[in-house]
């Protein structure tokens, strides 16, 4: 199965691109957990695009997107919800001794 992709684009030296990339680098495990590849591209205007594992466009932002908003967008998809349920079911259940 392929991975999701987040494309951060903007003019060369755009401070918004740098700020968005820094926010994403601050939480690398979040991207890994969500099977997300982050790509930076040069373009005429700042934009952030999220594509699903099937290559379809999930979301597009013309301004900075918070990492929590991004994670929530991904976590709300049916595929990600299923992944979370499967991970929870596979996790060892703690037992409490009385």
Describe every region a protein language model picked out.
Residues 1-98:
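Non-catalytic interaction/Regulatory regions outside core domains
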């Amino acid at each position: 199965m392929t991975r999701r992709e987040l494309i951060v684009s903007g003019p060369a030296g755009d401070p918004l691109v740098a700020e968005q990339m820094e926010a994403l680098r601050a939480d690398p495990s979040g991207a890994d957990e969500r099977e997300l590849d982050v790509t930076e591209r040069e373009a005429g205007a700042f934009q952030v695009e999220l594509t699903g594992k099937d290559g379809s466009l999930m979301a597009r932002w013309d301004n900075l997107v918070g990492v929590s908003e991004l994670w929530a967008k991904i976590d709300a998809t049916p595929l990600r919800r299923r992944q979370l349920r499967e991970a929870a079911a596979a996790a060892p259940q703690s037992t409490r001794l009385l």
